[in-house]
Every structure is written in C-alpha cells, then in structure tokens.
UniProtKB/Swiss-Prot annotation:
The keyword Calcium does not apply. It is found in: Cytoplasm. One of its GO terms (biological process) is pyrimidine nucleotide metabolic process. It holds the Pfam family Cytidylate_kin. The keyword Nucleotide-binding applies. GO terms for molecular function: ATP binding; CMP kinase activity; dCMP kinase activity. InterPro entries: Cytidylate_kin, Cytidylate_kinase_dom, P-loop_NTPase. It is an enzyme of class 2 (transferase). ATP binds at residues 17-25. Its EC number is 2.7.4.25. Keywords: ATP-binding, Cytoplasm, Kinase, Nucleotide-binding, Transferase. This is Cytidylate kinase. The gene is cmk.
Length: 223
C-alpha cells in the first residue's frame, strides 16, 4: 500500500486519468476483486450535465448549473443510475452530455456541490474511486493512488468501440478531436486540473489488456 488512510476511515484506492483511459472499467474490476464499493465520479458530472441540458441551460451559465448540481436528485442502484427517478445510464454516455460535463467541471460551484456527495461513498470495507481529481482533491489521504495514461489515439479508438457496442453512432475523427479538446480543458482549468498526485503511481495502459492493468493495480495494492 502507498500510505495509510486517515485513522478510522475506510481505505480508498483512487484511479484518475483522462477521458477513455479505461479508468472506469479498471475501477469496477479492482473493486470486484477486493469486494469494495466503487465510485464513478464522472457519472455525477454527467448527471449534472444531463439535468442542466433537460432544463435548457447553456453550459456558460455557471450559477444556474451550480444550482442544478447542488439540488441533484440521483440514485445509484448497482450498475443502474437514476436521475429524477428515471434510468439515465444510457443518456449520460452520449458525447453531447460528456462534452457539456467537461465544460461545467471547471466551475468551482459545481465541484464544491459534488465534493461531499463523492466523499459520502467512502464506506467499509473500502472504496475504489475513479475520476480526474480523486487522488488530489476528493481523497487526498487515499491508501493507493493510480494515474492511468494512454495514447490519445488509442483512447479515441477505445471510446468509439464502446459507443458502437452500445448502439450509439460514433465517428473516430470527431471523437479524436473532441478528446483532444477535453484533454486541454481538463489539464488547463484553474480548479482541480487533471494531473497526477505527487504520490500517485503513473500507469500507462496503452499496450496493456484490461486484465493486465487490473493486475498491475492489485500488485501495487498488495505490495
């Protein structure tokens, strides 16, 4: 283990990284191996984006979007996620929602509104949390911090394959352009920019299978 969690707190493994780096899949599989809970923090930002889009709010209206985040009515039930009582698992994976979420994630009001919601997922026996600032902001005392990286072309191909398998139309060139723009926004924003924590293990998954990446994380945990 990298460090000890705060006294009395459930242990946390954080897995941060850029969009489509595989962090969600890896987090779920590591959590399953350990018998822990999992937090997909990106889903909370996407749910906020979807709720704002349903209300016709432009992504530039920071106060209104922050108010939506503050009052967000969501429920997680296993693999299902509900927004205002309706299953939103398919909708939040649409690229329009993802791009909107990337823009509003830069707003301090939105990040603050979702901070305590994310920390509330920390329960025994442990939590695997994936996102962009899990190890730097949300769980700075995490027992193990992983920062996943992968070549942007590989990530775009991975996302394209995921969308097509879910029956969602996707264009590789469009995805690659959007991904580069989102990477720039995530790394350059003033609040909680995407960057590895000083004590994070940087893991390049470009040439690794999902199973190999999961094993690498488990090896770090058990070391």
């Amino acid at each position: 283990m990298a460090i000890s969690a705060s006294a009395g707190a459930a242990p946390v493994i954080t897995i941060d990284g850029p969009t489509a780096s595989g962090k969600g899949t890896i987090a779920h599989r590591v959590a399953k191996q350990l018998g822990w809970d999992v937090l997909d923090s990106g889903a909370l930002y996407r749910l906020t984006a979807l709720a704002a889009l349903r209300r016709g709010l432009p992504a530039t209206d920071e106060p209104a979007v922050a108010a939506v985040a503050q009052a967000l009515d969501v429920r997680f039930d296993g693999p299902h996620v509900y927004l205002e009582g309706r299953d939103a698992g398919h909708e939040i994976r649409q690229e329009e929602v993802g791009n909107y979420a990337s823009r509003i994630a830069a707003y301090p009001g939105v990040r603050q509104a979702l901070l305590e919601r994310q920390r509330a997922f920390r329960q025994p026996p442990g939590l695997v949390a994936d996102g962009r600032d899990m190890g730097t902001v949300v769980f700075p005392d995490a027992s193990l911090k992983i920062f996943l990286v992968a070549d942007v072309e590989a990530r775009a191909q991975r996302r394209c394959k995921q969308l097509i398998e879910k029956g969602i139309s996707a264009n590789l060139d469009d995805l690659l352009r959007d991904m580069r723009e989102r990477d720039a926004r995530d790394t350059q924003r003033a609040v909680a920019p995407l960057a590895p924590a000083a004590d994070a293990h940087v893991l390049d998954s470009s040439g690794l299978t999902i199973e190999q990446t999961v094993q690498a994380v488990l090896d770090f945990w058990r070391a």
